[in-house]
Regions:
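Acetyl-CoA-dependent GNAT
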Residues: 4-78, 82-91
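Active-site-proximal loop/turn and secondary-structure-junction residues that shape catalytic pockets
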Residues: 70, 104-106
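Long, compositionally biased, intrinsically disordered segments
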Residues: 72, 95, 112-113
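Short glycine/proline-centered loop/turn elements that form peptide/ligand docking sites
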Residues: 81, 85, 106-109, 126-131
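Structural preference for long, well-ordered alpha-helical segments within the folded cores
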Residues: 87, 111-115
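Conserved GNAT acetyl-CoA-binding A-motif
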Residues: 91-102
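Conserved catalytic-core motifs of GNAT/GCN5-like acyltransferases
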Residues: 99-101, 114, 119-131
Length: 131
């Protein structure tokens, strides 16, 4: 099941964030995104009664910025991230402009995005502190 994320999901999201990312978002960043900002569209994925992943984005008209997507470690590499991304992208039409950043070394994410027809349009030098 996929549903809109709320501030009540903060603890579970933070737990996944800290396990999945080398440089996790802070509780303040996550809280700000979950506090019903007018441009945020955030989703969580639930399996067997537990949160297993989430996607954070900003949407302004047809301009979509995927900010953060994560699946808890025990549920990775079995299709959940693809399901979450597919669900999210299906909400937009062909005229929508979808943007995201990904580390050049994050091959699983890059391969996932390629499945959805995403292609590189630019490189932001120094965007990530570790390359």
């Amino acid at each position: 099941m996929i549903r809109i994320a709320t501030l009540n999901d903060l603890t579970d999201i933070l737990s996944i964030e800290k396990k999945v990312f080398k440089h996790p978002w802070s509780i303040e960043q996550l809280s700000w995104e979950l506090n019903s900002q007018p441009v945020t569209e955030n989703h969580v994925m639930i399996a067997r009664g537990n949160m297993i992943g989430y996607l954070f984005s900003h949407v302004v008209d047809d301009d979509v910025q995927i900010l953060n997507i994560a699946i808890d470690i025990p549920f990775q590499h079995i299709g959940y991230c693809e399901q979450l991304l597919s669900y999210f992208l299906d909400q937009f039409n062909a005229d929508s402009s979808i943007h995201l950043e990904v580390r050049k070394s994050n091959f699983p994410a890059i391969n996932l995005y390629l499945k959805f027809g995403v292609h590189e349009t630019a490189t932001r030098k120094g965007y990530y502190s570790d390359g």
